């Protein structure tokens, strides 16, 4: 169910180079540079719609907002977006991200394989959510 706190919330950011960890485990992400003064939802993993600049098409996505506790808990919070079933070079482009529903809170996994397995579950759960919403 779309949280009343997320209705109408969206934010924009420029895709910047990350460390490539998501891509190396099969889940490429667009790392967004966000104005720190923007209002963002709480940390966690969200089903989201992402729109690429100069496009009106909303793409199903999964967004991680916050730290990367499994990779390196000392890294600053970040916004990363995985476009579901899309492989697009987004570096330097601006994206608009619209959170739809929170899937889960941040979790520190024992290893990268556990993280990758959970991301697959997140994607599957997001796809179930998108079936209930119009873009």
Residue ranges and their predicted role:
Residues 1:
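Contiguous mid-protein beta-loop-alpha structural module that forms a pocket-lining wall or clamp
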Residues 4-135:
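Phosphate/ribose-recognition catalytic cores of enzymes acting on nucleotide-derived substrates
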């Amino acid at each position: 169910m779309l949280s009343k706190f997320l209705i109408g919330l969206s934010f924009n950011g420029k895709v910047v180079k990350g460390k490539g960890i998501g891509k190396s485990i099969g889940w490429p992400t667009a790392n967004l540079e966000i104005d720190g003064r923007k209002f963002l939802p709480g940390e966690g993993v969200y089903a989201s719609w992402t729109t690429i600049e100069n496009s009106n098409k909303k793409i199903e996505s999964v967004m991680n907002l916050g730290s990367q506790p499994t990779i390196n808990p000392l890294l600053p919070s970040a916004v990363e977006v995985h476009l579901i079933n899309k492989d697009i070079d987004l570096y330097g482009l601006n994206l608009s991200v619209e959170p739809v529903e929170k899937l889960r809170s941040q979790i520190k996994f024992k290893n990268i394989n556990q993280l990758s397995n959970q991301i697959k579950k997140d994607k599957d759960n997001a796809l179930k959510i998108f079936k209930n919403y119009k873009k």
